[in-house]
Amino acid sequence: MSWRRVILLSSLLALVLLCMLQEGTSASVGSRQAAAEGVQEGVKQKIFMQESDASNFLKRRGKRSPKSRDEVNAENRQRLRDDELRREYYEEQRNEFENFVEEQRDEQEERTREAVEQWRQWHYDGLYPSYLYNRQNI
């Protein structure tokens, strides 16, 4: 029971000290800080628009009303960007597939050449010169 009282009393004391320190720092704001806050308010007003302007900006236009030029340009830029990304993706896929097919074709040609060469060596009877020396077109 005494530990609970000690913990409760120390947390209450810490809370009171924090409140007093916060009030002390807020009361000691100098003229420089006040001027800086005034400048910051001016900057905020330049950055942020009025609430009425913001609500008008965010209102959706009617379905039948024509799109503004900015909307059309933004949609066209987005569409062109999507087309370019799609084109790059399919080009990359096509290149990978062409490389794969070329490797498969090379492997198949190598296997076929080896099989034909083995067949010729097995069936060579010694009466004729070997195939390599008997080619018509070199």
From Swiss-Prot:
InterPro entries: UCMA. GO terms for cellular component: aggresome; cytoplasm; cytoskeleton; extracellular matrix; extracellular region; extracellular space; Golgi apparatus; perinuclear region of cytoplasm. Proteolytically cleaved by a furin-like convertase to generate a persistent C-terminal fragment found in almost the entire cartilage matrix, and affecting osteoblast differentiation. Residues 67-78 have a biased composition (Basic and acidic residues). GO terms for molecular function: BMP binding. GO terms for biological process: negative regulation of osteoblast differentiation; negative regulation of SMAD protein signal transduction; osteoblast differentiation. Induction: Expression inhibited by TGFB1, and weakly inhibited by BMP2. Pfam families: UCMA. It is found in: Secreted, Extracellular space, Extracellular matrix. Predominantly expressed in resting chondrocytes. Residues 58-78 are annotated as: Disordered. Residues 28-64 form a propeptide. Residues 1-27 form the signal peptide. May be involved in the negative control of osteogenic differentiation of osteochondrogenic precursor cells in peripheral zones of fetal cartilage and at the cartilage-bone interface. Belongs to the UCMA family. This is Unique cartilage matrix-associated protein. The gene is Ucma.
